């Protein structure tokens, strides 16, 4: 029984281009696929014929041989005199993933299974800032080692003027089918490692990798208000992708150094302010530091050690809302005088006596409560 002309099988002509052949195959394959026509032997045979025609006409070498010698170009032991004869076997054991992979992928770019595009890896860079830099914002230059798209082969890994070779083992699918008893098992093609093609002539600069190692310098704009563990994302500044895929991102991890004066808690700053016991008792005014210079801080009379005094708007601007700014909280530390001379000691002794001794109820209410508590504690023990 003579075979039908492959062009007529697909409903195309000898002048039809690759795109028209793919569209025709897609339409017919979806119509006659065995999964859509279970138990229909005619559809199964029709699908097998359609697939056979497509696999010949989509391959430039096989199509040329068919145009010259017809079906005899693919028969074993043919006598056409052509040394470049083809042998080919066809199978109807194709599922819809074959059609979508071979046809839809081809129509929307590429020939059969292209070498996988893989997005580049993300990178991390640890940046240390002073508190002033973190609060005000800054611009830092950093140098990072990374992988960049090879400028010679544009990331494809092939020698100039060449292209990846179509894998003959899997016919560009990246998978091969092996029969084991009643089952058909798919496995990764051992020749192209699942890529569908392979590089016969690799680029000399990148040795076929498509990427080269470089060290690049970047300027990083740090916004005001960042804090330790914040991250700044630089899009597409990570490693270059493979086979034309997008590059990864670079994440700059912020670490703020400990400051000799200020401690930060979210948008508020804290500092310790030592004052004399006389100022703590009588009140007064003292200069305290801020990140923007010195300011006056009013000390109320009878201020106790550990009291927090707030200076509004002298903290850190919010990174999310620049109209909001934290406060500076001054923790008062009342210093006990040291290195006293005899006169000072005498004056302090007299001052203490004026308080009705060092347990004066009126002048030292906390001391009074403390010693009363101590007395009750020991009384309870002796009962």
Curated annotation (Swiss-Prot):
Its main location: cytoplasm. Keywords: Chaperone, Cytoplasm, DNA replication, Metal-binding, Repeat, Stress response, Zinc, Zinc-finger. GO terms for biological process: chaperone cofactor-dependent protein refolding; DNA replication; protein refolding; response to heat. One of its GO terms (cellular component) is cytoplasm. InterPro entries: DnaJ (IPR012724), DnaJ_C (IPR002939), DnaJ_domain (IPR001623), DnaJ_domain_CS (IPR018253), HSP40/DnaJ_pept-bd (IPR008971), HSP_DnaJ_Cys-rich_dom (IPR001305), HSP_DnaJ_Cys-rich_dom_sf (IPR036410), J_dom_sf (IPR036869). A zinc finger (CR-type) spans 137-215. The J domain is necessary and sufficient to stimulate DnaK ATPase activity. Zinc center 1 plays an important role in the autonomous, DnaK-independent chaperone activity of DnaJ. Zinc center 2 is essential for interaction with DnaK and for DnaJ activity. Homodimer. This is Chaperone protein DnaJ. It comes from Buchnera aphidicola subsp. Baizongia pistaciae (strain Bp).
């Amino acid at each position: 029984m003579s075979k039908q002309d492959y062009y007529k099988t697909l409903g195309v002509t000898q002048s039809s281009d690759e795109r028209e052949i793919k569209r025709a195959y897609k339409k017919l394959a979806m119509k006659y696929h065995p999964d859509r026509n279970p138990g229909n032997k005619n559809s199964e045979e029709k699908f097998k014929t359609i697939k056979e025609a497509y696999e010949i006409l989509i391959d430039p070498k096989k199509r040329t041989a068919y145009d010259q010698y017809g079906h005899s170009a693919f028969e074993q032991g043919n006598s056409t005199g052509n040394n470049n004869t083809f042998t080919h076997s066809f199978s109807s054991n194709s599922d819809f993933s074959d059609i979508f992979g071979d046809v839809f992928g081809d129509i929307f770019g590429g020939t059969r299974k292209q070498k996988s595009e893989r997005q580049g890896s993300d990178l991390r860079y640890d940046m240390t800032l002073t508190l002033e830099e973190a609060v005000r914002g800054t611009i830092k230059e950093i140098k990072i080692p990374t992988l960049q798209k090879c400028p010679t082969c544009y990331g494809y890994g092939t020698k100039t003027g060449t292209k990846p070779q179509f894998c003959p083992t899997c016919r560009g699918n990246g998978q091969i089918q092996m029969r084991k008893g009643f089952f058909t098992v798919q496995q990764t093609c051992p020749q192209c490692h699942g890529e569908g093609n392979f590089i016969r002539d690799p680029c000399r600069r990148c040795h076929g990798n498509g990427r080269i190692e470089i060290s690049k310098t970047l300027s990083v704009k740090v916004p005001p208000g960042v804090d330790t563990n914040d991250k700044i994302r630089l899009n597409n500044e990570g490693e270059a992708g493979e086979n034309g895929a997008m590059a990864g991102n670079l994440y700059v991890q912020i670490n703020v150094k400990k400051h000799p004066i200020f401690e930060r808690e979210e948008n508020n700053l804290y500092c310790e302010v030592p004052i004399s016991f006389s100022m703590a008792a009588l009140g007064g005014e003292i200069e305290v530091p801020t990140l923007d210079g010195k300011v006056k801080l009013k000390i109320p009379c009878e201020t106790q050690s550990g009291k927090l005094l707030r200076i509004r708007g002298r903290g850190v601007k919010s990174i999310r809302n620049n109209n909001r700014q934290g406060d500076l909280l001054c923790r008062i530390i009342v210093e006990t005088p040291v290195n006293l001379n005899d006169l000072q000691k005498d004056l302090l002794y007299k001052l203490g006596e004026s308080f009705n001794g060092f347990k004066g109820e009126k002048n030292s209410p906390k001391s009074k409560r403390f010693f009363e508590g101590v007395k009750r504690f020991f009384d309870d023990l002796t009962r």
